[in-house]
Amino acid sequence: MEQYNVTGMSCAACSARVEKAVKKVPGVTSCSVSLLTNSMGVEGTASPAAILSAVQEAGYGASPKNASASKASDASADLDALADRETPKLKRRLIASLGFLLVLMYFSMGHMMWGWPLPHWFDGNHVAMGLVQLLLAGIVMVINQKFFINGFKGLIHGAPNMDTLVALGSMASFVWSTYALFAMTRAQVDGSDELVMHYMMEFYFESAAMILTLITVGKMLEARSKGKTTDALKSLMKLAPKTATLVRDGAEVTVAIADVQKGDVFVVRPGENIPVDGVVLEGTSAVNESALTGESIPVDKAVGDKVSAATTNQSGFLRCEATRVGEDTTLAQIIKMVSDAAATKAPIAKIADTVSGFFVPAVISIAVVTTIVWLLLGHELGYALARGISVLVISCPCALGLATPVAIMVGNGLGAKNGILFKTAASLEAAGRTQIVALDKTGTITEGAPRVTDLLPAEGVTETELLTLAAALESRSEHLLAKAVLADAEAKALTSPEVTDFAALPGNGLAAKLDGMDIYAGNAAFIQTRLTLPAALAQQAEKLAAEGKTPLFFGGAGRLLGVIAVADTIKEDSPEAIRQLQNMGIRVVMLTGDNQRTADAIGRQAGVDEVIAGVLPDGKETVIRQLQASGKVAMVGDGINDAPALTRADTGIAIGAGTDVAIDAADVVLMNSKLSDVPAAIRLSRATLRNIHENLFWAFIYNIIGIPLAAGLFIPFGLTLNPMFGAAAMSLSSFCVVSNALRLNLFDLHSTRHDHKTASPAAAPVQSAAENNKKSDAEAPEVKTEDNPMKKTLKVEGMMCGHCEARVKKALEALPEVDEAVVRHEAGTAIVTLNAEVADDVLKNAVEAQDYKVTDIQ
């Protein structure tokens, strides 16, 4: 996506105009314009010259963003681009405007209303009073000429905007007041004191100046608040190191960060920031990675561990090799991700975009009609104009245009601070609508690396003897489980002796000689070919297997020496994270390639709602497809084989420590690799959506109430609106919307206080996917295996509570072909386990006899 800076935009109508103009350029496939960041993202084959020309023809300015702006080495340039230059300019304009406005108000209202003294030469000189007011109002208009330049330019190009409304309102007040001044002068020449007083009451010079000043107040507050929405992005950019200490020819040399190349060796002392991504060659230390992950607890680093740019070396001296530099560093990628997300639009923004396209022309039409109607009702032109001007200046398309992007920007920034990165505005919106979360087991629910959990030595054998022998035998094996045994022996500082005649045997077994004694290891089936298992150990091993652990049997000299259990253990925060998801009304499904028995054990420990076992790597995408029939699905994974499922899901969530392929395929990236960040991400999305709805509500309600009030519809009830108060209301509307969005910065992502509570069904194994992996996508999703003859899923409407579930369950299980029915009113599903074929109509009739409606059977 090519990025451009856009100038001259003042409201949502402007951004809609630019977007519409660029989309008409041949070769442009998509265009997204951000009023908040005054930027534009364009995809397609169109040339930059054609795009810039289209923007200029629409009446705005544009320039390509520096291609290197996303590089960490040029973070200072990017930071400079985000600097708030608008607020100081508006502040200077406001101070100047206020100075002249106060003098104008003194002349126009102070003497008449409060008897404030005036220079004696103004006594009875009404023309002089009028000329002073004209001059002062004219000066305020010159100070705020930008409203007139942008407003009338937009009107000429057929794209009126907020500035057009302000310019028309202020100009109408000024022109009418100027006419009244000339008419009053003529009346004074003619000696008609009554007409002189009449026309003096028609002066609206103070309104012309007050409108501009109040709108400038609102613009300044809005600009200041908008500047705060990019604080998170600016703080990320400030983290980018400026220099690095390289080792060249045996000497340390300090160079600019832009000069660091991949493969360079750099050193980092305690207290220094790591300059680029790299791998530790020498030294140990604790590194604070909170800048990237939001996690304040330091992470221990040793030789071979990866380090990231902008993290802080806290304790030891590190010598590292650069692996990612410039725009490839983790920090640069995070900055780019947050920036790109700000340049995209959420689907919900289409509401405001649609309204903004016709809002300003509609307001101008309403103002004209209002003026004409009051004239036809017999009121004077000045009175009718006041009503029309009030309509112009109270209407605010800005609030509509800012309702969505400011909330998206703040939400994205808050997520980035906590190590949760949303790639687009659409993904931030979609995450909050999640109804089902599918979790890959390995590396997501579990640690992803097996470790020894139990040591069961046989009678007469110690744990140390068993582990020493096991390590000696497994030291020659490349199996993943062997590494777990070796790691446990190393952690206990055991030294394993050398073995000879090592062999990996068919049937998952190992054999070797240790000091002339035959030793062997393997699963239960293999070990029973060599010896007889003691009943007690066999029973214990069976219990371990039921818990999802893998028992490894070790023997020697014809007798069993013991059993070592190995398992991929559940992450400490996984059960709590899953419980939080369930309390948010989300169904949690675990996907795994393990056998059903192991999968069920892990599922029970984790507390998931459903377990789908036997899923081959290429079958995850099919499972996600099936789950989508029940609702919006978020897939959480970390491996290459998760990429198709992450892409297929409504929201793909990648664990940050996973593969680059998985991260590329995902919509959301969790830098912390903690499952507890999944409910936090959904919580943040829901809070952002709530904030957007609040903003849109107030923006619409403000205009729905304000425009009729300004037009005079409530005058019969004693309610009227002066143009000055209309301008004040308009100036505050955008400020209120932006301020409401900034409240998101106070939101606690990990607090469960506002979670929607719901009864969470107990963990239950659902189906084996062993056969399902072989099916094509077009086939029905019933799954048949030896243990699970057939399952069907019914979509049921009308269930509201646990009693409804019980009625449907009882009706289905009364059928002789149904062994079990798992019914959930939250998901609106009934999953039946069958022992024989049964027609769909039979199942449907059984449910509908209980006054519920079956909409689909799969």
Please name every model-derived segment:
Residues 89-243, 354, 455, 721-723, ...:
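Transmembrane helix-loop-helix hairpins at the membrane interface
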Residues 138-147, 154-157, 171, 194, ...:
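Hydrophobic alpha-helical transmembrane segments
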Residues 16, 29, 270, 434, ...:
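Conserved ATP-binding TGD loop and adjacent catalytic N/P-domain core of P-type ATPases
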